[in-house]
């Protein structure tokens, strides 16, 4: 029986809000093994997304039941060909911002990925499976996480990244009280300072 189930692992200790992506591609050992790294709006692999709020540890999503809400590229979810494919699930985590103007907004918090969800630490993904799409049960678990590529030391925050100064480039991070008060969430400006050659 054909089904697509995506599970939130019990190890997740918080409510999950965000965009779930279901990614498919032809098996190809010459490409990146992670399907999410093949996503591109130019010539990348097909992917399909639907937003969820309030997912909890242990929840299981029946993707076929969500078919009417799924948006896809470059074709519709129901047009995925029934044949041998590689599949993967990816979850873009959203943070909840309760702004001072009374509005509630959800969005991906940048942890140094530069706005690129494929590189943003703490987003979740599953193993890649090779399946006979349309003819078998597919089960994926979001049990992998994009790791922070450095140790977060005392006093550091992930927002705007944490870059090591170079001889002629200095990195500055400034906490904005005005933006933090508005978003009800700590907000920072980041800046790069290029020093002239032979600067002492």
Regions from the PLM with identified roles:
Residues 4-13, 26-35, 178-179, 195-199:
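Short amphipathic, basic-aromatic surface patches that mediate peripheral association
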Residues 21-52, 56-58:
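Contiguous segments within soluble domain cores/interaction surfaces
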Residues 52-78:
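A beta-strand/beta-hairpin structural motif
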Residues 11, 135-200:
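N-terminal cap/lid segment of alpha/beta-hydrolase-fold proteins
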Residues 1-8, 12-21, 190-191:
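Contiguous beta-strand segments within globular domains
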Residues 29-31, 91-112:
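Short acidic/polar inter-strand loop motif in beta-rich domains
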Residues 107, 114-148:
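Short Trp-Ser/Thr-centered turn/loop motifs at beta-strand boundaries
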Residues 78-94:
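A short tyrosine-centered beta-strand micro-motif
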């Amino acid at each position: 029986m054909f089904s697509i189930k995506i599970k939130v692992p019990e190890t997740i200790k918080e409510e999950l809000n965000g965009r779930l992506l279901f990614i498919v591609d032809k098996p190809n050992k010459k490409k990146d093994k992670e399907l999410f790294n093949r996503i591109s709006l130019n010539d990348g692999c097909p992917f399909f997304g639907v937003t969820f709020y309030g997912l909890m540890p242990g929840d299981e999503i029946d993707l076929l039941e969500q078919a009417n809400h799924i948006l896809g590229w470059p074709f519709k979810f129901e047009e995925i060909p029934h044949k041998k494919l590689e599949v993967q699930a990816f979850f873009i985590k959203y943070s909840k911002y309760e702004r001072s103007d009374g509005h509630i907004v959800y969005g991906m918090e940048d942890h140094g990925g530069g706005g690129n969800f494929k590189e943003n630490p703490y987003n979740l993904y599953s193993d890649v499976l090779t399946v006979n799409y349309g003819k078998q049960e597919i089960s994926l678990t979001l049990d992998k996480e994009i790791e922070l590529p450095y140790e977060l030391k005392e006093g550091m925050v992930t927002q705007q990244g944490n870059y090591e100064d170079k001889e002629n480039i200095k990195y500055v991070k400034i906490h904005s009280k005005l933006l933090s008060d508005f978003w009800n969430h700590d907000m920072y400006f980041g800046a790069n300072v290029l020093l002239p050659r032979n600067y002492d």
